[in-house]
């Protein structure tokens, strides 16, 4: 039993320390600079999309935090005096969530009706191939074509191919409606997970659901038919069912979770990150059961079941992807190709690209075609190129290594909208969109949204930090399940091909932790206020938070004078970037 407690504390400490460091780095990015997709000029005078950075004021963020804290304390004290919690039943809460879900779905349908956008970029390729399959055209599998290079995309293409039998081939609305339903499922599941994590604090589940709905960057991805939201819904479903298994030890939840993660990886291979996170907790559960079991046969069966859960998930991923391959091979008449080598994605993820560090730059295709589509030769060249990159970064970490990862972090995580508006710009629409809708996508409305969510992003990161600080001694390791998914997503995309459209799901799943952190913070701040209004009570943890935030901001301001800080955190691309961000050099 003592060994189990020690293991729990060690693992808990490692996870919380890693989370604290990563979230703190993102927090510094958020208060010192803001990233967005602007325009850069080539030597020939043509322009292209490029991530630009403008300076931000940490003092403004601190003022917003103070105002939100004051408002939160005032509302919380009124809430306590009104005794609403005593009259607020679980049935009433469930009805409110159902109502909000219906409202959210209606809002999503309305947005789709107001935009009716055709897919662009990669989603356009994906959906075009799905429609080609409807016509019996499987040329995308021929040498050098899309599925010859990216066979792992056949799962999402098969998904849209099947959807076309339901919604028809003349409209893109159907898959977008599926995105709305998937996002609603994600938000409900994250709320249910919060109830599992913090059973003693069930009142915050409604606040978490409201916060998720109000955070609109992910909402705008409902028009982006690339498998992100359906895959996320299945993956979060797998996490939720795994949590239910841990709570009840019901084998039905184990089977459901394994099936969900299998389907998720068919839709989006990046969902393997969720599998790894769940597997880590199941293996910990097995270890915990072994250390506790002694002569208890029930505990012994429990660790065997947890290990079996991991094996079942791996089998499900293999099985679902294998079944998908066989269906596609049967439909197309082509054998599934090997595709581009995975190591080439790491090389690309550690290289410069037109849009931003680590973004797509054509390397994976060039190294594949340049070696006559020989995967072994392509892997050898990619490995050699990777060694050169690592050697260059290690030989000059101050000017090459650290600044690259700083700029890549900003590119992936420091755009307040997570390029959600950029993903809608320039796409054709089946209708003439209203001026207000256009403004929200590419005009002054988009600027207003970006400014607002710049502060919201900081508040979310501060909320997560507050959660970690105020719950540092919590022994409930399982409440970190989705946080470990975020941790995996951050580490993976630090080295893999990156972009805000890849990282936004991992940021969204941290919102429940931010709400929990702010609620704990507001309650702690309220306890500091005496009935007479000004007398402070001794509360070491809360005092530490207040002093810590002030010290961190002051220290960061002082450190901010260094060149390294300016090349990694306080990024600034000059006045032209500011003009572009605020649309000062042009109209709507």
Describe the function of each predicted region:
Residues 1-110, 304-314, 538-550:
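Start-transfer (signal-anchor) and selected internal transmembrane alpha helices
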Residues 115-131, 135-170, 378-383, 398:
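Extracytoplasmic catalytic/substrate-binding loops of multi-pass membrane glycan-assembly enzymes
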Residues 328-430:
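Membrane-proximal stem/loop segments at transmembrane-domain junctions that anchor or position
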Residues 50-66, 173-174, 178-179, 404-489:
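Membrane-interface anchor segments at the N-terminal boundary of transmembrane helices
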Residues 220-231:
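Short acidic/glycine- and proline-prone juxtamembrane loop motifs at membrane-interface regions
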Residues 150, 154, 166-188, 447-455:
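Loop-to-helix entry region of an early transmembrane alpha helix in multi-pass inner-membrane enzymes
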Residues 177-199, 237, 462-466:
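Transmembrane-helix motifs of polytopic, lipid-linked glycan transferases
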Residues 198, 236-253, 286:
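Membrane-interface transmembrane helices that cradle and orient dolichyl/undecaprenyl
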